[in-house]
């Protein structure tokens, strides 16, 4: 019975965390983005998207606030930098949400250019390796002429 209660609690904590938005891309939750690495009895383990990410403290605070509001005051939020976060940890749902929001998800290995999230054209070009946040690059579609962000692979 104790094991079943822990499974239920773990699932409820995951559901709580799925409601915590990423502060830089609020259409994604911290679960969608793959920042939450583990939920164990009494502990949530997170990894920021990169060492020194300015949003890390905000994410920790928002997670803590959500856990407290859901009644999980005894759950610790811990940060691990190793292994480092990778775009491979973005969930399929997260990738779909990025695309629907107008941000091209990270490219697959060997892919040379992202499809335009506005019109779907593969005729795109990089404008700047640096986008609106350190995690994004600025691209433009040659078919519809719309600029868009690409979530960088790392």
Per-segment meaning from a language model:
Residues 1-154:
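Domain-level signature for proteins that mediate thiol-based redox and metal-cofactor handling
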